[in-house]
UniProtKB/Swiss-Prot annotation:
InterPro entries: Catalase_peroxidase (IPR000763), Haem_peroxidase (IPR002016), Haem_peroxidase_sf (IPR010255), Peroxidases_AS (IPR019794), Peroxidases_heam-ligand_BS (IPR019793). GO terms for cellular component: cytosol. This is Catalase-peroxidase 2. Heme b binds at residue 255. The active site is at residue 92. It comes from Burkholderia cenocepacia (strain HI2424). Binds 1 heme b (iron(II)-protoporphyrin IX) group per dimer. Its cofactor is heme b. It is an enzyme of class 1 (oxidoreductase). Belongs to the peroxidase family. Peroxidase/catalase subfamily. Bifunctional enzyme with both catalase and broad-spectrum peroxidase activity.
Length: 728
């Protein structure tokens, strides 16, 4: 039998069966190791901030401004101006952000990769990115795709006569798709299995359907009901961190420009980029309708031009919204849209490609919602009557949209960073006094250890302060000491009564030190909370026979209540923290999967997660002083007992109820009860990869390594939000 023409590799034409195929519910640790240095083509030590700061931003903007009206034959510009197209590109890059877990957003240039590059709502944006490639090519590593996409949106607005609020660089590109983001359970584009009950949207999702950035512009599931659309809009934009005023400003501001595309039936449109043929070179949605571009373009299927000034900032969106009575119609592609009743407004908007030809203004169901909903209507009418207020609101909302996932202002780069400090940035005052030195830190540790507070209390408080950090949107963390403020001080997971006691003692020590210090030296409570936690770790390590100093870098500030948005901060409350063996309620997602999610948000690797679990259990950080997972008779001593006893084959484990949430471990020989455990505890002996890690730390020769690795992982969490210092 001839083998001619056969692929020599088994993974050629067919994909082999994977572990995920065999065990679809298997715990996925890969999300803890994504975006590794092996995937990054930049040189070791490449400093993007340094590269960006060497950039001539004015020159980049000049090149982008010239590009706006340099229409290309391969993808001509509507109205001779790419500005509206680029606004949509930037909007859709940033608009995937959701507050529930801080994931999505413009921060890593993920629009370049699947699935976002092939979402139905992103149809055509493959061309937008190709149009700005010459600019990216010219400036290379000095500006990331993530920054360039947002900057291009800003320049587009400015080139159309709008004054933006500012721009900050600092978004570093990733080089592979995010694997940690849950976009929904649906397996079909535009499906909406994410709803339950009375249209209750699944957490943490924000978009209404798979493959949409926010809402269906035709109305819920294509039903052209403006009031129902308003309900979806309010829910979705709230989950994008926008209030009603910001929502109206963004929709009306964005729809001041450009048009949608629905020249023909969607059956003419070819596959999305990820499914397109090789020769299309990463471009998708190739259309067989006419020329497939310009006036023949098919995108959403809607054919809408909102204003008479589609390439110029104006108040015409509201003029049209309130100036006409609207009736339902359909686009050439059959999509629901709206036009003025009785033929009003005919010839009031320009055609995008035929000079002198005029059209009737049109609106989306999601636009009419701004008039139908009473609250949105009041805001819209106020903006209509006060165009300067509208412009200011849109400028601020656009800046928030495109910068929401960047974290604190210390990460902002470039000459156009606004000087104004905004509440949604979670501002923290920068210390303006001399910092404590090593001698001071040693003295403070001694005071803390003599205060009567236990190791468990010290470590628990520091963890509560630091573990709010989310690597997704760079929010939370120990800096600011917001653990002492609402809402964090009242979260069940933080054990409010114990927390108040610890903070009272630490607050008194802070006052005592600051009064006695000379030369203006001060210690912030944020720093002291971490110092106290470090002291607890060091004492516990010493009790286990290992002398070690936990690294500490001063410089944290203390945020005030006025600098803290309680509602915005509330989204950081964990529904689960496996590191403290805590579940806020009963969930369909197993506790061990919630642990992996928490570890990923903390930017921890699987070994770091493992060693932290083992250490925190024996240090006594469980919420409510639960005994689950405390596999030691030497509590508050930093031993590897958790792993040694977890791996002991002399223990037999059984669930304590049909819920399979809690377990008891009994001596195989005597039946005597030895330990209690949660799902989070037992997964470190059950899951093959986690067991392999546990075996490292449960070995006879691992005690010192265990302590060293715990201290390293602990310090990483304590410093996770310290963007003011260089991380190794």
């Amino acid at each position: 039998m001839s083998n001619e023409g056969k692929c020599p590799f088994n993974h050629g034409k067919r994909n082999g069966t994977t572990n995920r195929d065999w065990w679809p519910n298997q715990l996925n640790l890969k999300i803890l190791h994504q975006h590794s240095s092996e995937a990054d083509p930049m040189d070791p030590g490449f400093d993007y901030a340094e590269a960006f700061n060497s950039l001539d931003l004015a020159a980049v903007k000049a090149d982008l401004r010239a590009l706006m009206t340099a229409s290309q034959d391969w993808w001509p510009a509507d109205f001779g101006h790419y500005g509206p197209f680029f606004v949509r590109m930037a909007w859709h890059s940033a608009g995937t952000y959701r507050t529930g877990d801080g994931r999505g957003g413009a921060g890593r240039g993920q629009q370049r990769f699947a699935p976002l590059n092939s979402w139905p709502d992103n149809v055509g944006l493959d061309k937008a990115r190709r149009l700005i490639w010459p600019v990216k090519q010219k400036y290379g590593r000095k500006i990331s795709w993530a920054d360039l996409i947002v900057l291009t949106g800003n320049v587009a607005l400015e080139s159309m006569g709008f004054k933006t609020f500012g721009f900050a660089g600092g978004r570093e590109d990733s080089w592979e798709p995010d694997e940690d983001v849950y976009w929904g359970m649906e397996s079909t584009w535009l499906d909406d299995k994410r709803y339950s009950g009375d249209r209750q949207l699944e957490t943490p999702l924000a978009a209404v359907q798979m493959g949409l950035i926010y809402v269906n512009p035709e109305g819920p599931n294509g039903n052209p009901d403006p009031l129902a659309s308003a309900r979806d809009i309010r829910e979705t934009f709230a989950r994008m961190a926008m209030n009603d005023e910001e929502t109206v400003a963004l929709i009306a501001g964005g729809h001041t420009f450009g048009k949608t595309h629905g020249a023909g039936d969607a059956s003419h449109v070819g596959p999305e980029p990820e499914a397109a043929p090789l020769e299309q070179m990463g471009l998708g949605w190739k259309s067989s309708f006419g020329s497939g571009k310009a006036g023949d373009a098919i995108g959403s299927g809607l054919e809408v031009i909102w204003t008479s000034t589609p390439t110029q900032w104006s108040n015409n969106f509201f003029w049209n919204l309130f100036g006409y009575d609207w009736e339902l119609t359909k686009s050439p592609a059959g999509a629901h849209q709206w036009q003025p009743k009785g033929g009003a407004g005919a010839d009031s908007v320009p055609d995008p490609f035929e000079p002198g030809k005029r059209r009737v203004p049109t609106m989306l169901t999601s636009d009419i919602a701004l008039r139908a909903d009473p609250t949105y209507e009041k805001i819209s009418r106020r903006f209509f009557e006060n165009p300067n207020e509208f412009a200011e609101a849109f400028a601020r909302a656009w800046f928030k949209l495109t910068h929401r996932d960047m974290g604190p202002r210390v990460r902002y780069l470039g000459p156009e960073v606004p000087s104004e400090e905004l509440l949604w940035q979670d501002p923290i005052p920068m210390p303006d006094h001399p910092q404590v030195d090593e001698q001071d830190v040693s003295a403070l540790k001694a005071k803390v250890l003599a205060s009567g507070l236990s190791v468990s209390e010290l470590v628990s408080t520091a963890w509560a302060s630091a573990s709010t950090f989310r690597g997704s949107d760079k929010r939370g963390g120990a800096n600011g000491a917001r653990v002492r403020l609402a809402p964090q001080k009242d979260w069940e997971v933080n054990q409010p009564a114990q927390l108040a006691t610890v903070l009272e003692v630490l607050g008194a020590l802070q006052v005592e030190f600051n009064r006695a210090a000379t030369g203006g030296k001060q210690v912030s409570l944020a720093d002291l909370i971490v110092i106290a936690g470090n002291a607890g770790v060091e004492q516990a390590a010493a009790a286990a026979g290992v002398e070690i100093t936990v690294p500490f870098t001063p410089g944290r500030g203390d945020a005030s209540a006025e600098q803290t948005d309680v509602d915005s901060m509330a989204v950081l409350e964990p529904i689960a923290d496996g590191f403290r063996n805590y579940l806020k309620g009963a969930y369909t997602i197993p506790a061990e999967k919630l642990l992996i999610d928490k570890a990923q948000l903390l930017s921890l690797s699987a070994p770091e997660m493992t060693v932290l679990i083992g250490g925190l259990r024996v240090l006594g950080t469980n919420v409510g002083d639960s005994k689950h997972g405390v596999f030691t008779d030497r509590r508050e001593v930093l031993t590897n007992d958790f792993f040694r006893n977890l791996l002991d084959m002399g223990t037999e484990w059984k669930p304590t109820s049909e819920a399979n949430e809690a377990y008891e471990g009994r001596d195989r020989a005597t039946g005597e009860l030895k330990w209690l455990a949660s799902r989070v505890d037992l997964v470190f002996g059950s899951h093959s990869q986690l067991r392999a890690l546990s075996e490292v730390y449960g070995s006879e020769d691992s005690q010192q390594k265990f302590v060293r690795d715990f201290v390293a992982a602990w310090t990483k969490v304590m410093n996770a939000d310290r963007f003011d210092i260089k991380h190794n």
